[in-house]
Every structure is written in structure tokens, then in C-alpha cells.
Amino acid sequence: MFETHKVEIEWAGRPLKLETGKIARQADGAVLATYGETVVLATVVSAKAPKPGQDFFPLTVNYQEKTYAAGKIPGGYFKREGRPSENETLVSRLIDRPIRPLFPDGYKNDTQVIVTVMQHDLENNPDVVSMVAASAALTLSGIPFMGPIGGARVGYINGEYVLNPHLDEMDESSLDLVVAGTQEAVLMVESEAKELPEDVMLGAVVFGQQGFQPVIDAIIKLAEVAAKEPREFDPEDHSALENAMLAIAEDELRNAYKITEKAARYAAVDAVKAKVKEHFLPEGIENPAHTAEEIGSVFKHLQAKIVRWNILDTKSRIDGRDLETVRPIVSEVGLLPRTHGSALFTRGETQAIVVATLGTGEDEQYVDSLTGMYKERFMLHYNFPPFSVGETGRMGSPGRREIGHGKLAWRAIRPMLPEAEQFPYTLRVVSEITESNGSSSMATVCGTSLALMDAGVPLAKPVAGIAMGLIKEDERFAVLSDILGDEDHLGDMDFKVAGTEAGITSLQMDIKIEGITEEIMGIALNQAKGGRLHILGEMAKAISESRGQLGEFAPRIEVMNIPVDKIREVIGSGGKVIREIVEKTGAKINIEDDGTVKIASSSGKEIEAARKWIHSIVAEPEVGQIYEGTVVKTADFGAFVNFFGARDGLVHISQLASERVAKTTDVVKEGDKVWVKLMGFDERGKVRLSMKVVDQATGKEVVAEKGEKKDGGEAAE
């Protein structure tokens, strides 16, 4: 019934098995990949023909994690998987980015790749094996795809590169880098690092590419026995149309791209495009030689040619800069004084307002992943409204691009954040992109660094980011610093680098062509370093290090530690005690399992009141100390005073006042606030208190004069 084929190799010390022919046989391509004991199913389906009028390649990648893969049941009311998590969205992008450039130009059939995590061994991250499985499914499908690709994760532990480290090894690694590519070239890099130098990062990319070569060989071996017949696809030849268009539009298009201001340049380009359409699609012609989609596609290709030729020939760019110059930068902090920290970062026509908010442990994000529930104390959210590019558009929940850009900036900043023990705050940063003309994610990195320093968060060092581009034709190439939006769309590489003056903290690279050599990547990294250092210098004009104190409106957090066996007493039955403390003091209180207590409030008085209350519950009263208390009961022989949390003690009638007392109620009544001194404990462990040795007005001890009896004892010497 089944015609199965499989290959198995040893990869980084674990078995990798690729199998096809048994599961999902109605898909164009399907591969079940097993790495260690992590199992993923990748399927691909592509429509037999493009939709009418389709003018782009509609590729969708869906990565999904099933909770049964880790032996769990989903939370929530419905108890089933819902909308994609942030991690699922990020891995979907991770798979999409290296495979998208390998579909031929002109292929516009609706194509969907679905990768499902079926089993997770909690040792091997499923993202890399999902990339491998998707590549294998595409290679077997017969769909026009210039693969296969391989992918690998690289760690850097004790000065050594590690291929596909286990999940528990990543805690020791100063690098988390995922690289994907073909046998000849790198296509995608995504990484987070702890201030590593450029040569170490480049070495990791090369190490990773070498590391996934056995995987590509295995996919090719499987394809030799299991691949479907390739689909026929003959891209249309538009060279004649392009030459004709070049003849009538080249000069005007070149002049349009000499305009440095974005809006004016776009208007000039649109005018040329309208003229071209009018020429090739004159009104009244029923069956024109070319469709509007063909003319638009060829015109876009012509734009790219003119921009690229100009850069390679003149070393001058669209906005007049040379290859290495960064656009003018203006940095401001304290833009929104009632927020905890804020910054405005403007680089050319790209601008971000970034706001930092400090919270408590209650504000931490709970993340439910296949590896278990964990709490995240740093969140970074990136918003890209349509007005930032002068357009109208959809508003609502963030899209994949916004989630991906936010995570890139998050990776860049996180290594510089203080440890929770040093700075026990939850941090949320929001980047509002208000203008965009290239590299808004790197503007977010810079703005986040500024806003956190403005908020008083003790960053180890400021962080800046820069986007690099590449134009390559045959042996000629130009590496561009701080690319514009057009240079991103029309170029061959988008290479984002973020870090401090000492090293790289985050790197993301997407390459659209083959042939990017180690030499070119090295040039780009070193050129990016110069740009990054320049940007850090410009940022320092606004603020160069974190403020010494938090903003006026930020909450204060005081940390105290209590014995673990006292946690129950502080919380109380059903949370009664801690609720009372919160209600009466106004402070927020978070108690962790190890006895760490975080008390938060914008008022120092509220924090101190809560701290004293908790201290009174967990601490033992000390003999000789003076405490404030409340009379809770009176009797003929004295008064009972609640003086130390829930602890009561007796003030004998002889200790109520220095003079003789006939009746307890002559001195105190229930509810009275009094000062008492702990004199000691009787033979049964009962507390003995005294009021007469304490000045009831000031709470200070009364010093007995010479010859007077002290504390009810013998006369002092």
C-alpha cells in the first residue's frame, strides 16, 4: 500500500531520518523528519496555475506546534490550539526566508508549506529540523524550486563552535545562530550573541554552512529515488518589452532617481510609470500586446537595473550619499515626561518614538511553550502604522513582519539588560514607527537603548543597529551602509547588525542571490562596525549612560528575603494576610517560591509600611526592643497588646505606668495604640511587656534616674 523511501544520517552526534511515501500522500511533497526523538511533518502544495492578474509570488509558510508533541493538553476554555504563538510566527519566517529566493522569477502559483511538530524530545529544537523537512518536501514535490537548502544552529561554548547544541547547552552558549543556505551559498542568518567580535560571527556562519552540507546530500539522495517529475515552467521572455521601455523611459527614470527626497522621488517615478503605461496600453485598444501586470513587472525590473547600474558605476546612491555614509541622526530623550522613559530616534527619513515602561513581577509575560511554562520579564513590541510610509492600510493585531522586527530588536538589547537580582523590574518597550524609509527595525534598536537609559535601567552598554545592503553584478559589487527602502527592495542583500562598541549582539541576514562569498560578508561586517560606532557616537549626544535614578512616575521595588517556611504565614489562609497588606498599604507584593519578596509602589511610605508588616510576620521579636502595638484585651491583671504582626503579649498591671495603677482601664482601653518594650519571656514562653519604661508620647525608652527602681526591679546602683 505504501511506497516509502527514507534516508538516515548521523548529524552532530544524533540520527537524522527523512522519510516520504507513507504520510500525507495527496500533498505535492511530504516528508517526515526525525532528529533525535523530535519529529516534524512538512508538506507542500502548489496550485497548478496562477490566479488571473496575479503579479507576485504568493508563498505562505505555516509552522505549528501541537501540544501533544510534548505530552501536554492546551490551556484555555476550548482546550485546543488557537492562533499562532509568537514562536510559531518567528519559525514560520525562519523557514520562509531562505526558501523564497529559490523559486524562479515569474512563478506566481499559490504555494503553501505547512510544518507540524508531531513529537518533541525536549532536547532538540524543532526549528532547524523543520527547515530541513520543508526543504526536502519542496525538493521532492516537482514544484520549480532551485534547492535543496540545509540549515543548522551554531553555539559558541568555551571558545568553541558547537553544531546543533542541545536545548540545555544553550544556557552556556554566548551565541545562538541559525544559518541556512545551499551547497554553494548562505541565504539566511538569524542570531543573538553576547558582544562577540565580527570574526567570531563570520566564523560561525561559515561553520554552520559547512555543518549542514551532509543534510543537503541526504535530501539529494532521497530525491534521486522519490522526487516527482518536475513541473513544466517556462518563464515569459520580456526582454523585447524591456528594451522598448528602456528606450522611452531610461533618461526620465534616471533623473527621477537623482531626487533625494523620498516623496518627491516617488512622485517622479510614478509619473514616468504612468507615461510608460499610456504608451504601451493606449486607450481604445481592445487586445493590447501586453497586460498591465506585465508592464508593471517589467517597469519594476527596469527600476532595479537603473538604480543598480548607477550605484556600481558612480559609487553614488539614490539620496546622494557615498557607499559608507550614514544618514543624519537626531536623538532625543524625555520626549514624554510622564512615561517612565522615552526617546525619539530619527535617521534620515526613518523615525521611531520608543517608550519604556517599568512594572513588577505581576506584569511578567507567561509563555506556554512545548518545553514548559516560563516567565519573560522583557518585552519589546514594534508597531508599523501605514502613515509611516504615507499610505492608508489595515490597523489591528501585529502582522508577521511586526513580530519579526520586534524580536530582532529584542535580541539586540537583551544581552545588555541587568540581571533580575540587580534590577527586579519587568520591562516593556514599545516602538512606534512614525516615518519609514529603510531600516526601521534598527531605528527601534537605537530608540530602545535610549528609552531604557532615560528610564534609569542600568544597561551594561548602549546598543545601536545598522542595516547593510549589497548590489552585485558578476564580479562587481558594492556594500551599502544604512540602506534606504528602495535599496532594500532593489538590492541583493538585507544585512542587519546590532551591537555595542565592543561587539555584536544581534545579526540578521537575508540574501536574494547566490554567490555571496565569505569575503563579501566580511567586508559587510567590518563596514557595519564603522557605521555602528558612528551611530553610538550620535546617540551619546542625547544620553551616553543610564540615569542614576528612576523617573518620577516609575514604580519603586524593594526586595527582601524571608524564610521559605514563613511564606505561608505571609500569604495567610486563602491569601487573607497578603490581601490585607496590599489593601492597607497600597503596595504591590510578589512572593516567589525561594522566599524572595518584591514590594512595589511609587510611594516610598507604602513600600516601607508593607516591608515592616511582612518583617513583623516573619521575624522574631527581640528582647530589649521597643515596639508599637495595639491593646486587644484588658483584664484585672493587665492588658494584652498585639505588638509584632500577629503576636500578642501581656503588660502586667504593675508595668502599665510608673505610678501605682488600681484598675487597668484607668490607663488603657481596647484599641489604644501604645509603645511597649519586650522585657523577656516567662518560664512558659509567654511574652512579658512593659509600658512604663517607654515614653508613650515619643516611643523612646525612659531612662531611670539614680535611686529610682527600674523596670520593677531593685534600685539602680
Swiss-Prot record:
Keywords: Cytoplasm, Magnesium, Metal-binding, Nucleotidyltransferase, RNA-binding, Transferase. Mg(2+) binds at D488, D494. GO terms for molecular function: 3'-5'-RNA exonuclease activity; magnesium ion binding; polyribonucleotide nucleotidyltransferase activity; RNA binding. It is an enzyme of class 2 (transferase). It is found in: Cytoplasm. Its cofactor is Mg(2+). Involved in mRNA degradation. Catalyzes the phosphorolysis of single-stranded polyribonucleotides processively in the 3'- to 5'-direction. This is Polyribonucleotide nucleotidyltransferase.
